[in-house]
């Protein structure tokens, strides 16, 4: 039996330990990464060897939250280009290694990860941003993940089958229509 786990609105952001009261939610202790890892492990304990499809349904990242510069949240416009958004995503990912570990866990087992863009991470529809995330995941996949570690084509083919991006909605193999819903 195939299982689908749908999560949305994690709003991963750059973390800061600065003591601004209005930005306290950005402290590492409030990041949802450890809970996500625990959730994935609980799901795997329940489903055994059945296949899993993890659908990350929008606002997984939050490109609108001010970036951290010199330890402080600094108001800045949302990234508009692939280059700007990739740099922002790389900074976010630097603070969320456990999130990447959870994705690697799912992919390493041969399961799928699907990203659907939301209103706070619409930049995921940009190829440069997708490649930034793919590169981070690829760098942490075990060597045994690839059929032929010397072949980048094999690596890309397998990863592109298991890790997919959709700009608006996703239709699962079981016919379930999944969208973030910010269009309404």
Segments and roles (model prediction):
Residues 1-184:
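Extended recognition/assembly regions associated with phosphoester-bond processing machinery
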């Amino acid at each position: 039996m195939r299982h689908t786990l749908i999560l949305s609105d994690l709003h991963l952001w750059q973390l800061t330990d600065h003591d601004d009261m209005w930005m306290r939610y950005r402290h590492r202790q409030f990041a949802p990464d450890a809970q996500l890892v625990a959730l994935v492990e609980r799901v795997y304990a329940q489903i055994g060897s059945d296949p899993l499809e993890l659908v990350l349904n929008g606002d997984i990242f939050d490109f609108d939250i001010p970036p951290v510069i010199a330890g402080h949240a600094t108001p800045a416009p949302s990234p508009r280009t692939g280059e700007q958004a990739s740099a922002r995503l790389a900074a976010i990912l630097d603070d969320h290694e456990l999130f990447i570990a959870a994705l690697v866990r799912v992919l390493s087992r041969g399961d799928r990860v699907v990203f659907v863009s939301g209103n706070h991470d619409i930049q995921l529809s940009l190829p440069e941003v997708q490649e930034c995330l793919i590169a981070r995941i690829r760098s942490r996949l075990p060597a045994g993940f690839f059929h032929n570690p010397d072949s980048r084509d094999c690596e890309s083919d397998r990863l592109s089958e298991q890790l997919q991006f959709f700009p608006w909605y996703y239709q699962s193999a079981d016919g379930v229509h999944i969208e973030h819903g910010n269009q309404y």
